[in-house]
Amino acid sequence: MVRVPAMRTLENALRRVGFMYVAGVDEVGRGCLAGPVVAAAVVLHPDRHIPWVSDSKAVPALERERLHDRIVRHAVAWAVASAEPTEIDLINIHQASLRAMQRAILSLAPLPDIVLVDAFRVPELPMAQRGVRHGDRRCSAIAAASIVAKVTRDRLMRELHGRDPRYGFDRHKGYATADHLEAVARFGYSDVHRRSFRPPTLFDTLD
């Protein structure tokens, strides 16, 4: 894990040259068979360090929950947005992910002066942006966004499980685990499944 001071280096450097509000953005759920893709954008307070903020995939679930609550409590601004399965099926997961990130960024108040992105450039933003390779491991703002997005989506998938427990969304969060695929083979699609995500060996008989 990268030390926290090192993960703030880029953000601090950008503030020194005039970018007062530096946002990080990230998304989760790209590879799932069910549920939305969820994006979060976060502007961290420059004087409030939150220890152990790192890539959400590297943080245990209970610790993610704790960090999520600290991030949203102390951030200058934060926002989440999503693209639902119907939108994903209509425009593809890549475009839906970009739209979710764009929505999250534009929901921030105040709007950031610059956005740090982990991978692809987010279209149609009115502010500067900068790509940071492996940003969720190298940049606190992106790592914080990763945690907020992950916890938000996990909570949503648990809610979806409460509405329809047949698929086990509380366990696999919509990913293509063996028990999830078995449930789809048995019960068919639910209204939160992405019909464009179709492992053909299993799903060709489900139409």
Where do the model's predicted regions map?
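RNase H-like, Mg2+-dependent phosphodiesterase core
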Residues: 1-207
